[in-house]
Amino acid sequence: MQQLLTKEGFLLTSLDDLMRWARSGSLWPMTFGLACCAVEMMQCASSRYDLDRFGAGLFRPSPRQSDVMIVAGTLCNKMAPALRKVYDQMAEPRWVISMGSCANGGGYYHYAYSVVRGCDRIVPVDVYVPGCPPTAEALFYGIMQLRNKIRYRNIFDRKDA
C-alpha cells in the first residue's frame, strides 16, 4: 500500500514524525553566556559560520521564546538559581546544550569553592560540547547531535531533574 501511494506522489508519515522533523529543523536558541565560551558562541552567528543554515541562527532574548538553552562558561553557585529559574520559564519541549569544560564539569575552576561542578547538577543536559573554549565547529556538531536526538527519539519520555 505504501509503495503504491509513494508512486502516486503521496507521503505517508505519522504526526509524531512530522512534529519531530519540524522541531529539529527550527531550533530557537537562547544564550546563557557566562565566560569565554560565549565569545565562541557569538562567533557561530557571524557570516563566516552562519548558524542560520541549521535553523538556529537568531538567538532569542526571552526564555519564553526559546526552546534550546546553550550554557557557555563557568557556572557559579550564586548564578545557579538564576539558571534554574530561566530554565523553568522555558516552554516544553526544551533542551539544554552544555558548552565548554567549565559548564560540563567545572573545568579549570573545578576545585574552587564557588563553582558548580557541571551545570547538569542544576538543569538536565541533553548535549555536552567539550573544549576550552570549544570551537564554532564543535558547537555546530553539538547542535547537529541535538537535532538528531530530537528527530529520532521520543521527547516526552525524559524526566526533568
Swiss-Prot record:
Catalytic activity: a quinone + NADH + 5 H(+)(in) = a quinol + NAD(+) + 4 H(+)(out)
Entry binding sites for [4Fe-4S] cluster: C36, C37, C102, C132
This protein's GO CC annotations: plasma membrane; respiratory chain complex I
Cofactor(s) it depends on: [4Fe-4S] cluster
Protein localization: Cell inner membrane
GO BP terms in the entry: aerobic respiration; electron transport coupled proton transport
Cited InterPro entries: NADH_UbQ_OxRdtase-like_20kDa, NADH_UQ_OxRdtase_20Kd_su
SUPFAM superfamilies (alphabetical): HydA/Nqo6-like (SSF56770)
Record keywords, A-Z: 4Fe-4S, Cell inner membrane, Cell membrane, Iron, Iron-sulfur, Membrane, Metal-binding, NAD, Quinone, Translocase, Transport, Ubiquinone
Cofactor remark from the record: Binds 1 [4Fe-4S] cluster.
Protein EC: 7.1.1.-
Family assignment from sequence similarity: Belongs to the complex I 20 kDa subunit family.
Free-text function comment from the UniProt entry: NDH-1 shuttles electrons from NADH, via FMN and iron-sulfur (Fe-S) centers, to quinones in the respiratory chain. Couples the redox reaction to proton translocation (for every two electrons transferred, four hydrogen ions are translocated across the cytoplasmic membrane), and thus conserves the redox energy in a proton gradient.
Name of the protein in its database record: NADH-quinone oxidoreductase subunit B
Organism: Coxiella burnetii (strain RSA 493 / Nine Mile phase I)
The encoding gene: nuoB
